[in-house]
Amino acid sequence: SGSAAESAVSALARRFGTLMGMTALVIGNGEMGRLTAALLRDAGCSVTVTLRSYRHGETVVPAGCSVVQYGERYSAMDGADVIVSATTSPHYTVTRERFAALERPPRAAVDLAIPRDIEPGVSEFTQLYNIDDLGVSCEIDPATLARARAAIDAHMERLHRWDNYR
């Protein structure tokens, strides 16, 4: 996950020459979002991170970053220089229609999510990068792959037993 966040920040730095003094909105406060927010902060950006109000437990936001509720993300991105979205949402966190309505749309957007967070049509209004553009590989270490396969096999065995029992 570090390589995707680093690639995103590097791509933005190449695009603008520097990120110093720029404003960034990071949508998503999972591991990838927090890492990206911290890297943007370290590059000199003023960073805002979205939070979902229904999540329980302790919320960790990188030091020096401000917070906005997820539902307020469009207000927060209006006037921001860059946005990065890194959620596990099954739907778009940024739609073409809502992005098109912004008075001062961000100059670049980075989508680190699989499946995509940012509707591809957003590219009509700003420079849009996604995981493929950044050349990030999603390699899985053999131990993790073995654990995943074992979990799938166990689940399939339970499913077959249930199906045979019916």
List each model region and its residues.
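Rossmann-like NAD(P)-binding element
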Residues: 71-96, 107-110, 114-115
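Short, well-ordered coil loops that connect the C-terminus of an alpha-helix to the N-terminus
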Residues: 18, 63, 89, 104-105, ...
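Short, glycine-/Ser/Thr-/acidic-enriched flexible segments
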Residues: 31, 54-55, 89-90, 114-115, ...
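Adenosine-phosphate binding glycine-rich loop
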Residues: 99-166
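Short amphipathic alpha-helical segments
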Residues: 37-39, 61, 95-98, 120-123
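Hydrophobic, well-ordered beta-alpha structural blocks that scaffold small-molecule cofactor pockets
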Residues: 1-86
